[in-house]
Amino acid sequence: MLTDRQLLILQVIIDDFIRSGQPVGSRTLSKKHEIALSSATIRNEMADLEELGYIEKTHVSSGRVPSEKGYRYYVDHLLSPQRLTQEDIQKIKSIFAERIYELEKVVQKSAQILSDLTNYTSIALGPAVKENKLKRIQIIPLNQQTAVAIIVTDTGHVENHVITVPASVNPSDLEKMVNILNERLIGVPLVDLKDKIYKEVADVLRTHIHNYDSMLKTIVDTLDIPQEEKMFFAGTTNMLNQPEFSDIQKVRSLMKMIEQEKDFYRLLRKHNRKGIQVTIGRENQLSGMENCSLITATYSIGNEQLGTIAILGPTRMEYSRVITILNRVASDLSTALTKWYQNN
C-alpha cells in the first residue's frame, strides 16, 4: 500500500515524464509547487518507489522513469478525466457532419480523426460482415454476356462484382430471378444465404425460370463475401515522431508488427469488452509492442456491439487525454450509427 506522499510523488513523476520525455530527478521534483518536501525526503521516497517496482533507473541519467507497473497503477488509480477543448469537440462532430451512407466509411473517418487529435496511431475494426444481413441485390446488364452484381447489406456495406451471364439466360428471366431473390432473402444474415438459397429458394426459381441453374451458381458465388472485419489504420508514421522510437531497431519491430495485420487483428478481437481498456507494454503479449500501450473502446448499434476503435502509442502516452477522446468518439459513433440504422 503506497502512502499519500508516495502517491503524489509517483503521479508527479509520471505526469512530468509524459510531458517531457526526460527522466525525472529529486531536484526537479523539489521545484514543483505541489510537492513541499526537501530533496532528501524526495530521494528517500523515490528509492522506496523504485524498490517497490513503480519507477526505474535509466542508463543515461540519474533520474527515474515510470515502469510498466507504475503506468498500470497510474492508469488504474491516479488518472482524472481531461476536459476536451471546443476545437476537439468540433473535430469529433465533423465525423458525423455528412449523411451516413456506408458504415465502414464512418468508421474509417473516425480512425483518421482519432489520429489527428492524438498524434498517435489509430486503428478501427469494422463490423464483422458475417453479422450483416442482406438488404438488396441488383444485377445491371453491361452487354449480352456480362453484368454487374451489386450486393447491399443492412449496414451499408456494398460489394460490386462483374459476372458472366450464360447465353441460355434471357434478360427477363434474369430480372425475375433478382426479384425472387430479393423477395426471399432480404433480412437473411450473409452467413446463411447459401444454405437458404439451395434449401428454399432454388425450388421457387425452378418453377418460374427456364435454365435457372446455369445462373444460380454465379449468384451464390457473388454472395460469398469475405466475412472478417475490415481493419483501418491511420497515422502509422506518427509513432516515428516519438523519442522512444528514435532507435531504428524499435521502429523496425513496431512496423513489422503493424504490417502483420493478423496478429494485430487477434489482439483487437481480445479487446471486445464494453468500455475503455488499456494494455501497457508487455501486457499486449505481442512482439514489437514492448514499448507501446494500446487503448481500446467498442462501438455499437443499440445494444448490439459492432466493432472496436483503438489508439496505439508509446507507454509514455497522454493517457488522460486519449481515454477522454476515445470515450467521446465511441459514444458519438454509437449514437450516430444507431440513428442511421433506425432510419434505414
From Swiss-Prot:
Keyword annotations from UniProtKB, A to Z: Repressor, Stress response, Transcription, Transcription regulation
Q: Name one GO molecular function term.
A: DNA binding
This protein's source sits in the domain of life called Bacteria
Disulfide bonds, which pairs?
Answer: none
The reply to whether Transcription regulation figures as a keyword in the UniProt entry is: yes
| GO BP term, example | negative regulation of DNA-templated transcription
Transmembrane regions: none
Q: Establish whether keyword Transcription is in the entry.
A: yes
InterPro entries reported in the protein's UniProt record: GAF-like_dom_sf, HrcA, HrcA_C, WH-like_DNA-bd_sf, WH_DNA-bd_sf, WHTH_transcript_rep_HrcA_IDD
Q: Give the record's family classification.
A: Belongs to the HrcA family.
What this protein is reported to do is described as:
Negative regulator of class I heat shock genes (grpE-dnaK-dnaJ and groELS operons). Prevents heat-shock induction of these operons.
Name the chain's protein: Heat-inducible transcription repressor HrcA
Protein's organism: Geobacillus sp. (strain WCH70)
Show the taxonomic lineage. Answer: Bacteria, Bacillati, Bacillota, Bacilli, Bacillales
